[in-house]
Amino acid sequence: MSNIAESARIHPMAVVEDGATIGEGVKIGPFCHVGPHVVLHANVELLAHAVVTGRTVVGKGTRIFPMAVVGGDPQSVHHGGEDTTLTVGANCTIREGVTMNTGTADFGGRTIVGDNNLFLANSHVAHDCRVGNHVIMSNNVMLAGHVVIEDRVILGGGSAVHQFTRVGRHAFVGGLSAVSYDVIPYGMLNGNPGLLGGLNVVGMTRAGIDRAVIHRVRRAYKAIFEGTGSVRENAAAIRDEYADCEQVVQILDFIAADSDRALSSPTRGQKG
């Protein structure tokens, strides 16, 4: 039997399969389908025709709009029907036609989406992705498998992110951009192929980062990408100078981390 809270409101034309867990205050509209291994925490709302399936947990207060499919099998030739999972955080908005897939067994079997995110119509989160908090994915954005999107990233409409690519916190990706390489925190990337166009100064300002700090980050950016060495060599060379600047340290740590992808740069030649 399903575990359904007394205060949950389920339309008689919805299907909630035996075994599902439905929390307090959940609302499920007509023609929705909730699978047997799904957990909907308090005050989740499913509008008409929304589907939540697979081994999926949806955090409190999240709203899922019509025709979204959350928790479908991974779109991977390597998936053999294993019991993999999707976790969606609290207070997310998942608009019409959004698709989110569970993970694949070979890579831990988990797709994880954080809190307070906005997924606009027809955007896609593939298997094994990690999406942080306060992320905005505009209409038709596509994340391939194993992508990492850090906190407060904005992805413009129709942009596509290559598998295993990382996009650092507070980065901005312009509409219709092809993100083939890692994007540094606070970076601004546009185009196909995607190239860095400087820093996301507007986003940094909106985040309350002091103007003097923004100027320091700009100087560090110039030293990293216009220095005589490789990007990683230049980043290592300025670490002591900027050890007291949280934002620069985040960029330097991102550059130094192991990754399957090269780094996006301001030029067509990628510097590692």
UniProtKB/Swiss-Prot annotation:
It is found in: Cytoplasm. Keywords: Acyltransferase, Cytoplasm, Lipid A biosynthesis, Lipid biosynthesis, Lipid metabolism, Repeat, Transferase. GO terms for molecular function: acyl-[acyl-carrier-protein]-UDP-N-acetylglucosamine O-acyltransferase activity. It holds the Pfam family Hexapep. Pathway: Glycolipid biosynthesis; lipid IV(A) biosynthesis; lipid IV(A) from (3R)-3-hydroxytetradecanoyl-[acyl-carrier-protein] and UDP-N-acetyl-alpha-D-glucosamine: step 1/6. Its EC number is 2.3.1.129. CDD domains: LbH_UDP-GlcNAc_AT (cd03351). It catalyses: a (3R)-hydroxyacyl-[ACP] + UDP-N-acetyl-alpha-D-glucosamine = a UDP-3-O-[(3R)-3-hydroxyacyl]-N-acetyl-alpha-D-glucosamine + holo-[ACP]. GO terms for cellular component: cytoplasm; membrane. The keyword Nuclease does not apply. GO terms for biological process: lipid A biosynthetic process. InterPro entries: Acetyltransf_C (IPR029098), Acetyltransf_C_sf (IPR037157), Hexapep (IPR001451), Lipid_A_LpxA (IPR010137), Trimer_LpxA-like_sf (IPR011004). SUPFAM superfamilies: Trimeric LpxA-like enzymes (SSF51161). Belongs to the transferase hexapeptide repeat family. LpxA subfamily. HAMAP family: LpxA. Involved in the biosynthesis of lipid A, a phosphorylated glycolipid that anchors the lipopolysaccharide to the outer membrane of the cell. Homotrimer. NCBIfam families: lipid_A_lpxA, PRK05289.1. PANTHER family: ACYL-[ACYL-CARRIER-PROTEIN]--UDP-N-ACETYLGLUCOSAMINE O-ACYLTRANSFERASE, ACYL-[ACYL-CARRIER-PROTEIN]--UDP-N-ACETYLGLUCOSAMINE O-ACYLTRANSFERASE, MITOCHONDRIAL-RELATED. This is Acyl-[acyl-carrier-protein]--UDP-N-acetylglucosamine O-acyltransferase. It comes from Rhizobium etli (strain ATCC 51251 / DSM 11541 / JCM 21823 / NBRC 15573 / CFN 42). The gene is lpxA.
